[in-house]
Design a protein with these regions (language model features):
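Periplasmic/ER-lumenal interhelical loops and adjacent helix-loop junctions
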Residues: 1-62, 69-70, 76-84, 93-98, ...
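Contiguous transmembrane helix-bundle modules in multi-pass membrane proteins
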Residues: 64-78, 87-171
Length: 171
């Protein structure tokens, strides 16, 4: 197998973001779709991480660039080829998703750990950004891989997590 000559994109980034919804069917071969679900709260916590001023910008930038690199590499054939040891995967696509999930959960933990940097406004803004991602996914993605009901349930869970953070913040 040789290195791909032409760069191709397997799917759009919003199609990929829709994989964060609860109940999405795990992908094993079709369409190279990565299995990204690592909790509905992660969308909220990722935006809280971004907004939290108690987390140094020098720590945020490389970590968020790594998140972006992972996200792009799931959808790009050349990066996917490199991630799979210079072979195209046979069977389970995007085998590096466990590293991506670990990174996201680590960032989410840091956002919660630095809870003093999560003002009520920032929690509400992070909630709105997370819900905006879901609305964009609903509007612009292929609804065969994720149903409106799954998106709605994910949005309700994010609302619940935001309310828990607001309640915890008040104490």
């Amino acid at each position: 197998i040789s290195f791909p000559e032409k760069m191709e994109w397997y799917f759009g980034l919003l199609d990929e973001a829709a994989r964060f919804c609860i109940g999405v069917e795990p992908s094993s071969t079709v369409g190279h779709m990565p299995n990204l679900y690592c909790g509905a709260a992660i969308l909220l916590l990722l935006f809280l991480y971004l907004l939290n001023r108690r987390i140094r910008i020098g720590a945020k930038i490389p970590r968020l660039l790594l998140v972006a690199f992972f996200f792009v590499s799931f959808a790009n054939n050349k990066l996917d080829f490199i991630w799979h040891g210079f072979h195209f995967p046979d069977g389970l696509p995007a085998r590096q998703t466990f590293l991506f999930a670990f990174l996201l959960l680590t960032l989410g933990y840091e956002a919660v750990r630095e809870e003093r940097g999560n003002s009520i406004f920032k929690i509400l803004f992070a909630f709105l950004l997370a819900e905006l991602v879901l609305v964009l996914c609903f509007r612009f993605t292929d609804l065969e891989q994720v149903t409106p009901e799954q998106m709605l349930l994910t949005g309700l869970l994010i609302l619940g997590y935001a309310l828990l953070l607001l309640f915890y913040r008040r104490k």
